[in-house]
Amino acid sequence: DEHGVGMSFHMSPAKLDPEGFLEEFGHRPMIHLAEIGVLKDDVSITHCVQVDNQELAVMAETGVSVAHCPTTALKVSYGVTQVGKMPEMAMAGINLGIGTDGNNASNYSDLMRATYLVAGLFKDARTDPQMFPAEKAYEMATLGGARAMNAQDEIGSLEVGKKADVVLHDTDRPEWRPLLNVMNQLVWSADGRGVHTVFVDGTKVVEAGRMLTIDEDRFWAQCQEAGEAITARSGLPDKSKYPVL
C-alpha cells in the first residue's frame, strides 16, 4: 500500500495449499487471506485451481485478479479441468489474466500457446463450445493481464494515451492462410513462432523474428552452457528415454 505496487503470489495450484491452510489456520487459503486483510483489488493470484465456492465468492467481493496458467496445470496435473472454476470466476466478474508460470513447470513462455489452451480446456471440461470464445481468451491475454498488474491505464490495448505495445505477425504462413477470421486464427492457429515485429512502448525490439536488443546467438550459447552446468552440479540422472545425437 505504501508504494502503490500491489502484490502477486502463487496460491492453491494443487491440494497441498488448502490442506496445509486448513491444518494450520482452520480455513482455506482465500478465506484466511481475506480475514487478515491481504485480498484487495491490487492483488493478483496465480493458479487458483483448488478453490471452493466460498473462496470464489470472497475473491469476487475483494476484487482480486487471477493469473490462469493452463500449461503448468496440465503438465503438473493440478486437476484444472476437473475442479477448476475459471468459468465461474469469469461469470462472477473476477478479472482473469493468462500466465505461463515458470519454465521449470510449464516448459515454455509462449503466451499464445497458453491462450489456445484457455480457449479450449473448459469447452471440453464442460462440454460447452461457447466456453471462453477466442475473443474472451484474447482479452484475458491482453487487458486481463494489464488489469492484473494494475497497469490497464498504460498497457493492454491500443488506445490514445497508452504505451504503443504492438505485435505484428507474418501472415504469409500456413496458420494464417486463408486469412478469414483473424481472431479465431490468432487464438487457435498462430503461436509465437509467427511473430515478425514487436514494438514495446514505441521502440522496436524484434524484427524478422529476432531480438534487436541482445546478441541472440551469444545468448543461446550462454543458455546452453548454463543449463549444462546446472545439470552437472545437480548430480541428477539424465531422464531422456531416447538417445540424443
Tell where the protein language model's regions lie, with residue ranges.
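His/Asp/Glu-enriched, well-ordered alpha-helical/loop segment
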Residues: 33-42, 87-176, 189-191
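Structural signal for hydrophobic packing residues in well-ordered secondary-structure cores
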Residues: 1-4, 37, 119-123, 149, ...
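Short, acidic/turn-prone active-site loops that include or flank metal/cofactor-
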Residues: 13, 70-75, 102-103
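Conserved, mostly hydrophobic/aromatic
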Residues: 10, 45, 59, 66, ...
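Histidine/acidic residue-rich metal-binding segments in metalloenzymes
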Residues: 1-65, 78-96, 113, 153
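Active-site microenvironment of metallo-dependent hydrolases
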Residues: 139-245
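Short, charged, surface-exposed secondary-structure boundary motifs
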Residues: 76-81, 108, 178
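Short glycine-rich, flexible loops that bind phosphorylated cofactors or substrates
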Residues: 53, 74-75, 105, 176
